[in-house]
Amino acid sequence: MTTPATILIVDDEKHTREGLRLSLEDDFDVYVAGNSAEAMEILKGDPVDVMLTDLRLGGESGMDLIGQALKLSHPPICIMMTAYGSVDTAVEAMKRGAYDFVTKPLNLDEVDILIKRALRSRTLEKENSELKRQVEKKFSIEAFWARVRS
């Protein structure tokens, strides 16, 4: 049995946090935070696979939180949520490192699919890196033996 992915939901609106938590907790380990400080405390404590953050967190910015989260040694995949959806906001979030963007009101099936797609993408990136490392190692060993034989 595999360990479920860890999701962090960051939103200053309690009903949004709790609704998402209830929707996702059957498939994932879910943490919730109401602001950037709570989110960073969780992120620094345990590795988080995916962070869903609202654009506006009271007086704080979800964009800034993404920037902080991506500087961690094990950065989460970041997905921006907002009721203030615009193409400009989506582009800016992705320029700052967000994997994707979703608008409120949230379609819970869409959020679930988006998270699973993000996790699959990260898994494929890790597998690709490992295969690349193995190929490089193989060719360096073959080059070594070619030099030894000549």
Regions found by a protein language model. Give the residues of each.
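Short amphipathic alpha-helix used as the core "switch/output" element in two-component signaling
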Residues: 41, 56, 63-74, 92
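Active-site residues of response regulator receiver
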Residues: 11, 54, 82
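AAA+ ATPase active-site-proximal loops
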Residues: 132-150
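Acidic, metal-coordinating helix/loop segments flanking the phosphotransfer/catalytic sites
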Residues: 32-50
